């Protein structure tokens, strides 16, 4: 059963969270957030595979992610979903006796613009022979078409978008070489040269032959394997990359990476990197503005949990959750989810337990997660997907509605049967796939059919979505990267300011739609929009109509 609804106060000085009645008993706090299962109606017939007869290793239990990205530039976010594939007996103790034909693989679903999708995987050339885990999207060559980086066991693959509906594997040509188990990645322009660089997170030195007698079902955990170093590749702005792992200082740290995201947490104009590790201290790499990073997680208060122990971190999200104008950090976890309030002093205060958010999910294992205004009331909400860790134990999922001033309420039981339906969730990605102004979600379920959750909330407020287009192209060599990754956007409406930074990856093994979504509540228009581009340019727009997708071009910004 779900816990009673919480009033969650995101200030450490306020003390323990106080229980309040269920939302349906409190009219002024009644939630309108609702989701419906739209999987069948949308035509997304995807089933994930972990490649064996039963879960028998860390590799099989990790799961896979997804990404929303507009690969054909028609204004409708398309969906790429990852899967494991059939494992040979050398990689599993429980091989399939009758492997499926064809083998399980990734799928690309083209958005038809009417709420339905068409599987175009083979046409696009996006069916690799890979046990895939995570995916991120970025226009690495600034040609106007979004490319893909797929990570998995044994290698990572860089797909170039050819602009005609097809993709080409350019991994070797681009100089991307990642061995071992690359589990996640993110894109960032760490040197602000207008070309996005690539960070690849690696998990452990997985050995399928190793068995731990003391492990449950002879299933070794992350600490039974050696950790790995992550990789940082500098974009040379010519379609190739250079491995700068050691030069940047990233290579000095060995972890067990699960999730990674990058954003300018300290507001100095340069993107930093947060690495969520499993059973190992987390990393926060602060950008030193000279091509190198310093690891400050301990000093910043994000290396360990409140008990001083390493956490089982999964999916990190940077967002201004407490409304302070600074980027806070939300991390899903196998035990206690963590909400870390940015203290404005190059650090964070862990308020997850004090707020009650951590306890609300303590009985679950949390994986995919997103921080969005699901009801467009001008306040950020949090959605979390759960599932068993080492067994296929399905769990229900969670929705926390933002109430303002750092307070949240658990409204999961009122959010629709698709939220309370138990699955073994892993990666999740978020987008307004039908362009109705409400954020939807897609979740990959381990070894089972995936779920498309359509946001059908009623009585919602106004909204605006912003698509950024940096000035740099494959012919123009000045300005910000084409995707606007690293840009920070302020939206002012009805006297309130909201801040969102354009990031690449977010949550667990996944990436959300690149358009920045702002719920506006009753505001009849947007008073002001300010874009702080990575190039240093600042662009202001005033008196903008709401309830639409707005494209902002850096080429129109003052020089």
Model-inferred region functions:
Residues 42, 52-53, 359, 389-393, ...:
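Gly/Ser/Thr/Pro-enriched helix-cap/hinge segments flanking short amphipathic alpha-helices
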Residues 120-140, 145, 150-190, 200-223, ...:
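Asp-box/WD-like beta-propeller blade repeats and closely related beta-sheet repeat scaffolds
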Residues 79-83, 143-152, 198-202, 268, ...:
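Hydrophobic beta-strand segments that make up the repeating blades of beta-propeller
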Residues 35-38, 116-126, 166-176, 239-251, ...:
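Blade-edge beta-strand/turn elements of extracellular beta-propeller
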Residues 105-111, 228-235, 286, 397-402:
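Beta-propeller blade signature
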Residues 44-65, 102, 124-136, 175-186, ...:
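Repeat-based blade/solenoid architectures
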Residues 82-101, 202-225, 384-393:
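Short, conserved, GDST-rich strand-edge loop motifs in beta-rich repeat architectures
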Residues 63-73, 110, 131-146, 160, ...:
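Beta-propeller blade termini
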């Amino acid at each position: 059963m779900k816990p009673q609804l919480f009033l969650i106060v995101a200030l450490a000085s306020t003390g323990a969270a106080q229980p309040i009645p269920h939302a349906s008993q409190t009219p002024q706090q009644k939630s309108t957030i609702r989701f419906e299962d739209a999987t069948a109606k949308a035509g997304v017939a995807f089933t994930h595979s972990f490649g064996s007869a039963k879960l028998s290793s860390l590799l099989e239990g990790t799961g896979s992610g997804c990404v929303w990205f507009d690969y054909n530039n028609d204004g409708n976010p398309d969906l790429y979903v990852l899967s494991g594939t059939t494992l040979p007996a050398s990689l599993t103790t429980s091989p399939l006796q009758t492997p499926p034909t064809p083998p399980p693989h990734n799928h690309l679903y083209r958005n038809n613009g009417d709420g339905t999708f068409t599987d175009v995987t083979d046409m696009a050339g996006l069916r690799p022979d890979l046990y895939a885990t995570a995916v991120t999207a970025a226009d690495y060559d600034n040609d106007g078409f979004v490319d893909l980086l797929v990570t998995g066991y044994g290698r990572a693959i860089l797909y170039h978008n050819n602009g005609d509906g097809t993709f080409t594997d350019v991994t070797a040509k681009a100089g991307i070489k990642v061995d071992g188990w690359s589990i996640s990645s993110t894109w960032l322009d760490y040197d602000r040269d207008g070309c996005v660089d690539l960070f690849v997170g690696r998990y452990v030195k997985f050995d399928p032959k190793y068995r731990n007698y003391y492990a449950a079902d002879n299933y070794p955990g992350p600490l039974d394997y050696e950790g790995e170093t992550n990789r940082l590749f500098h974009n040379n702005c010519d379609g190739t990359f250079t491995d700068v792992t050691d030069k940047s200082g990233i290579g000095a740290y060995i972890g067990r990476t699960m999730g990674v995201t990058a954003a300018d947490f300290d507001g100095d104009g340069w993107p930093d990197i947060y690495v969520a590790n499993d059973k190992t201290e987390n990393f926060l790499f602060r950008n030193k503005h000279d091509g190198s990073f310093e690891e400050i997680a301990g000093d910043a208060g994000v290396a360990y949990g409140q008990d001083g122990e390493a956490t089982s971190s999964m999916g990190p999200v940077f967002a201004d959750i407490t409304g302070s104008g600074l980027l806070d950090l939300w991390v899903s976890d196998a035990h206690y989810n963590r909400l870390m309030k940015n203290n404005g002093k190059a650090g964070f205060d862990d308020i997850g337990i004090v707020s009650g958010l951590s306890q609300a999910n303590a009985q679950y294992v949390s994986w995919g997660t997103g921080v969005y205004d699901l009801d467009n009331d001008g306040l950020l909400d949090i959605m979390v997907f759960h599932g068993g860790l080492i067994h296929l134990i399905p769990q229900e999922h969670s929705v926390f509605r933002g109430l303002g001033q750092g307070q949240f309420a658990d409204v999961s039981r009122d959010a629709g049967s698709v939220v309370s339906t138990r699955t073994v969730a892993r990666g999740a990605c978020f987008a307004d796939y039908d362009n109705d102004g409400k954020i939807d979600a897609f979740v990959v379920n381990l070894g089972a059919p995936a779920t498309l959750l359509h946001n059908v909330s009623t009585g919602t407020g106004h909204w605006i979505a912003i698509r950024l287009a940096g000035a740099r192209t494959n012919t123009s060599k000045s300005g910000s990267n084409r995707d606007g990754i690293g840009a920070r956007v302020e939206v002012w409406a009805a006297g309130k300011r909201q801040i969102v930074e354009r990031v690449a990856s977010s949550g667990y093994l996944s990436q959300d739609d690149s358009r920045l979504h702002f719920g506006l509540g009753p505001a009849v228009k947007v008073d002001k929009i300010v874009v702080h581009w990575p190039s240093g340019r600042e662009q202001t727009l005033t008196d903008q109509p709401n309830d639409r997708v707005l494209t902002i071009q850096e080429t129109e910004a003052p020089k």
